[in-house]
Amino acid sequence: MNPYALIDLHCDTLTDCIHKGLTPDTLDDPDRVLSLTAIPSDVHWAQFYAIFIPDQHRGQAAIDYYETNRDNFNRQMEKFHDRISPCRSASDMQAAWEAGKTAAFLTIEGGAALAGDITRVKKLADDGVRCMTLTWNGENELGSGHTTTHGMTDFGRQAVREMEDRGILVDVSHLNDTGYADLFETARRPFVATHSNARAICSHKRNLTDDMIREMVRRNCLIGLNYCKSFITDGGIGDSPDDLYRHIEHFFSLGAYENALGSDFDGAALPTYLNTPAKAADLYEYFLEKGMSKELAEGIMFRNAEEFFRKNL
């Protein structure tokens, strides 16, 4: 039994086309984890396609890299216009679904795309960007990722406020612990962790602490469960959906019911039970078999993200 819909808050499929030097017209490449054909035909699908900005890119190099991938996104939306539709809102997503198309949101992973220029937030919003991860693993002009110890910069705080004003969701996945504390002092609106799990279950620093989770609950934020093996179990050991379910149970125990999915397709090593879009859709039936209510299961698959979009995009 498949769900009515599935909303995936993160994949690296778009920049995988450029990053590996392959042809750009590959949203339907069968050699990738995520392709349009691989999406179950009976599931209304929404996908956040991230432009990943490598840590080494700064200034004009970061802008050029972003624009190359933005242009590729636009080309692919045109190339596959009968199967996928670019979206900027929940209503756009619903319209795409009603037309039998995948809903595609353009996002960014790495605030270096701003090149330290606050006026670029408006430019990104005008381009259709609807979510931006502030950092990747290292440092950029906004702050520091989990491999470093510094917090957010003054520019990063300014960028968060501007993103909120321009309708770009603030994504805190990859931000380090100090940066989280700074973000909590800065953010005025609900934000997202597009692809993060619970650190109490898997101790990787990329995952959220209990205090972070509680604060996100208090602020009506959204958390996307990450499929990366290294963020599900310590050492990436094990290959059972029960491993991911332990994170869900822990989130629930902290009052974090506003969970979603953030696959990291084409950007991470995945367990065999989550290494295709069809298997991700199978989570719905698995949740029901575990005794989860239909309401909670549908919430994780799509309803929580859909409602968050309606309120915040």
Put a short name on every predicted segment:
Residues Y227, L254-P277:
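Short acidic/histidine-rich active-site segments
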Residues P30, G238, D242, L274-A278:
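Soluble non-cytosolic domains of exported or imported proteins
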Residues Q60-A61, G235-I237, T272-L274:
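Second-shell loop/turn segments in exported
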Residues M1-N2, L313:
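Basic/polar N-terminal segments that are highly enriched at the extreme N-terminus
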